[in-house]
Amino acid sequence: MKEVLKRGMLKFENSFFSHVVRCALGMIIPLVLTGGISCAVRDFPVAPYQMFLTQGGGRWFYDFLTMVYEGTYGIFSVALVITIAYSYAMEKNESLENVVMYVVVALAAFSAQLNLGTEDFDVAGLGTTGCFAAMFIGYLSCMAFSKLRRCHKLMLEQYTAGMGGGCVLAIRTLIPLGIVAAGSGGVNLLIGRITGIYGCYQWFNHIFYAACQNIADYSNFLSGLLYTFAVNLMWFFGLHGSHILEAVAVHNFGVTGNVVFSKAFYDVYVAMGGCGTTVSVLIALLLFFRKERTGKLAGLASFTVVFNLNEMLTFGIPIILNPILLVPFVLTPVVCYCLAYAATVCGFLPVLTHEVVWSTPVGIGGYLASGSWKGIAVQAVGILAGILFYLPFLKINQRMEVYKAKRHVQVLIHELQEKEEQIDQPVFLTRGDHIGMISRMLLLDLKHAIKNKELYMLYQPQVYSDGICIGAEALLRWNHPVYGMICLLYTSDAADDLIGV
């Protein structure tokens, strides 16, 4: 049973979709962190500081931080479409020219459902609110474009024979691109005429808004539970759940002082460290995995997690699309939600009556929300419960990580050996798929190993049958801290690339 689960998890993690989405989301981490940090600095909850920014001489700095935030989060969906298309094409090992065409097609398909030039256009669709549509349409448009390119009748090859220049590929892909863009716009128009709602991201918001509204009328606890579960489940699949459901939260979960659950309640007592209550992950890694790769990553991510920006952890470990960590990632916030809700219902915590900015650090947020140490205590209990919940899964993930790493290197070495047998020059570093990514990662590790003198020589004596030693064979060895002994073939091949670096 254990082997079946292991194979199933590996199959999911190594799937084409998983590689594309994880790579695409990883590439926009700088965008997210830049915008998130600017927001955290702008909204840091200290009254004199806020007075200085909004009413004193620091107004220019406030405007600057706002521009940075809007300039990053405001184009989040556009950036995601580009990285999805790029990752899709690179995973297909396409040429640079084809990669560009994939990006153009995805942007055209995404733009076709934004209702540009009509009164239904909403600039929010370009930002984090539209990231579900960006991922969904970006991936499907690339898939459709890839299939249409296989139809030679659509590629206009007879019209480009003998033609030179960069426009050849553009002409050949004219019809496939037009079909994909027109198809996206047509579906948007058709569903809009039927439902009266135009725009993919607006369809999703409307459905979830209606569901939350119906449940909220019946039970504030259940509607909050649904919201908590849905947000973190979306995050697991790489969708920025809190941003996708922002409109739902504004309409259904505002701070009124009459009900327990609100968006501010979720930010303070549930989303500690970000989605999945990842402050618990951070502490667990720092306490129990200090010497491992994930422990070192946690040290690097500490500053951003303090402000509830956890992308370095969720994509670095990774947690996103990692089936091993699905259960604690989704259910730890549910546990924290139930603890905080119970503490409020029984009177230990007061009902939240004012907004608390989502980027407020843990501890400060608990104090501001409750006005006393009680909010901090509830946060601490939730974090401790999260550590205990996450810990066994993190240990399993660590073992699986070592297993996967060695397996990936075995695949790389196997391909390298095949190239050697065929007397063919291996070209791994320029490949766009996961083999290329592993090769480039190992090349960086080899640079570090050479710099720190971690490579060494072993000498194997050559002895005649009569016991006389006639010489020795020198063997270059590299003991990688994760992958173990690296094949001499790769070490020498990568060294050739290092000479040219």
Q: What is the role of each PLM region?
A:
Residues 2-12, 51-57, 256-261, 314-420:
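Transmembrane alpha-helical segments and their short flanking loops
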Residues 10-156, 320, 329, 334:
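Early transmembrane hairpin of solute transport permeases
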Residues 40-63, 190-274, 286-289:
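Helix-loop-helix hairpins and the membrane-proximal interhelical loops
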Residues 116-222:
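Membrane-interface helix-loop-helix junctions at boundaries between adjacent transmembrane segments
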Residues 170-177, 311, 316, 412-435:
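Cytosolic juxtamembrane regulatory segments of multi-pass membrane proteins
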Residues 249-329:
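Helix-loop-helix junctions within the multi-pass membrane cores of secondary transporters/permeases
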Residues 426-488:
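Active-site core of bacterial EAL-family cyclic-dinucleotide phosphodiesterase domains
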Residues 490-501:
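Single conserved hydrophobic/aromatic residue that forms the stacking wall/gate
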